[in-house]
Amino acid sequence: MAALTTNIKALFDRYNLEIPNYQRPYKWTRKNIEDLLNDIENAISDSARYKDFRYRIGAVLIHDDREHDRMNVVDGQQRIISLFLIYKHLDSQYDCYLSRHACFSNRESQGNIQDNSAFIRQWFSSRDDHERNMFISAFEKTLEVVVITVDDPAEAFQLFDSQNSRGKPLNPHDLLKAYHLREMTDDLYEMEHAVEKWE
């Protein structure tokens, strides 16, 4: 297990982030997005007043899946997707592994992504170019996340089970889904088929 601190833009640029099938749907609402945007706005204000100010968004737990050359997000999915939606709005041309490989077949996830994207557009509609550029700069300098990387899938799932008390609590069926899917890590077809049936 290794841990390092990086800015959000570097997290998107340097890691082949993927949201694995065992993850629950994307559940963040407009209220969660509004709180996050306000936190970022406050961090931007603080960074203007205090030299070298950094705002730590939280921790992200990822499994380094070297066999498939990707980094599976084990914990922190809701924050990562939300931050990505904000950054993608600020720079519509931005391209990274996550933007090319994110696939949300779950209707709840799709609906929340659409709703939150619309809210982000509305929220920024009253901001000028300077304010938008300050947000971009914050993603590159001010906003940080602790990235915890594990190589062993079993260790990743053990940490996943212990970490889910943070953020939005997991439903019992989400925990059961994660528990059963982790036993299928050697058979990708079986896992994908099980996810389709589960959803």
Where are the model-predicted features located?
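Covalent nucleotidyltransferase
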Residues: M1-E199
